[in-house]
Amino acid sequence: MNIPKILNNNLVLKRIFCRNYSVKVLGIETSCDDTAVAIVNEKREILSSERYTERAIQRQQGGINPSVCALQHRENLPRLIEKCLNDAGTSPKDLDAVAVTVTPGLVIALKEGISAAIGFAKKHRLPLIPVHHMRAHALSILLVDDSVRFPFSAVLLSGGHALISVAEDVEKFKLYGQSVSGSPGECIDKVARQLGDLGSEFDGIHVGAAVEILASRASADGHLRYPIFLPNVPKANMNFDQIKGSYLNLLERLRKNSETSIDIPDFCASLQNTVARHISSKLHIFFESLSEQEKLPKQLVIGGGVAANQYIFGAISKLSAAHNVTTIKVLLSLCTDNAEMIAYSGLLMLVNRSEAIWWRPNDIPDTIYAHARSDIGTDASSEIIDTPRRKLVTSTIHGTERIRFRNLDDFKKPKSPKTTE
């Protein structure tokens, strides 16, 4: 898409001749159950932010209902946009663009955000920026940490995704591994819900956070009490549906045995440890593969809702340190779905003059196709080796024990022939 010269020049002139001018972008996020709006500027300031989620209805319905989410977005977006503008002390004419999530996510939910963004951009004659939700998660670190430089590795873990990638630039990503089925957040959520009522202290708390709290109360070896086999998936890919299925089957067997009571904290600790070991084993393969090619970035950014889990983050950090990689976690407030990351990703695309932007209001279509699934970047899985030289001893990701590896070459050495005297 060609950038209209007059719009491009206006933005450049503002930044050159207005000493205190800072580009401002309104972001809209509706990929799932969070209705979110935010305004950020080029100085990396969050001028305003609003988020709304109907958790009570989700608890009543036992999870996320896409139609309910869409209705929530439609009813609340106008109010949240107006409040953001008021809180920021900004009028629409002071904005430089509108950014909106277009993929991936629940299509029916995405459409509501897209519709609101199109209407706002056309009404106020602003450029419209389509943003990739998962890229925004990775790029959100740039909003709060100026030490991060391209290229950096990005591990994104959420209720809908799990992927291992490298961010080479704002819109240039390489995908090295992803979940072939399920996600870590959904796995933990569904298994935990089958445990039943976790107690009144967890009312109003996301079930994933409840699992982490309960796991912290487990016995010393609680993380080993309910083990399952890790999924066998090629290269750096993952499978969380297999983990979910194994634990649901285990729960069913335990309940059929009337003599066995389930220790909830130990069960949560085992589930959490299994998810962490699976992620770590695949991240290790990624590290080994890129290290052999001498192109492993020295910074690793962890984002997405599951990154808020301190145990899983700790396991990844511990493994990364063993590979001489610095781990950086996105702020807790930016780990879950938010509009700040959408606005700032859009701002980066704007100042980099992205060809994906609809610069002229008259060129903005009446609708934009929403995609349920969309890879974060180009497929680079062919660069991942099938069998790394060293195998991670996954049990060592727990606690303070030093990370250990097994050199696979040792297993291939021929045994010395026995001698007889």
From Swiss-Prot:
Any idea of its EC number? 2.3.1.234
Q: Where is the transit peptide?
A: 1-22
| Keyword Transit peptide attributed | yes
Localization: Mitochondrion
Q: Which reaction does it catalyse?
A: L-threonylcarbamoyladenylate + adenosine(37) in tRNA = N(6)-L-threonylcarbamoyladenosine(37) in tRNA + AMP + H(+)
Q: What does the entry's cofactor note say about binding and number?
A: Binds 1 divalent metal cation per subunit.
Which residues are recorded as binding substrate? L156, L157, S158, G159, G160, D189, G208, E212, A308, N309, T336
Instruction: List, alphabetically, the CDD domains matched.
Output: ASKHA_NBD_OSGEPL1_QRI7_euk
Report TM segments: none
**Which biological processes are named by the entry's GO terms?**
tRNA threonylcarbamoyladenosine modification
What positions does the entry give for a divalent metal cation binding? H133, H137, D337
GO-annotated molecular function: metal ion binding; N(6)-L-threonylcarbamoyladenine synthase activity
Give the observed phenotype of the deletion mutant. Answer: Enhances longevity, resistance to oxidative stress, and perturbs mitochondrial reticulum morphology.
SUPFAM superfamilies named among the record's database cross-references: Actin-like ATPase domain
| Record keywords, A-Z | Acyltransferase, Metal-binding, Mitochondrion, Transferase, Transit peptide, tRNA processing
Query: Needs which cofactor?
Result: a divalent metal cation
Q: What is its main location?
A: mitochondrion
Choose one Gene Ontology CC annotation of this protein and give it. mitochondrion
Class in the EC hierarchy, top level: transferase
Q: What does this protein do?
A: Required for the formation of a threonylcarbamoyl group on adenosine at position 37 (t(6)A37) in mitochondrial tRNAs that read codons beginning with adenine. Probably involved in the transfer of the threonylcarbamoyl moiety of threonylcarbamoyl-AMP (TC-AMP) to the N6 group of A37. Involved in mitochondrial genome maintenance.
Q: Which family does it belong to?
A: Belongs to the KAE1 / TsaD family.
**Can you state the subunit structure given in the record?**
Homodimer.
State the name under which the record lists this protein: Probable tRNA N6-adenosine threonylcarbamoyltransferase, mitochondrial
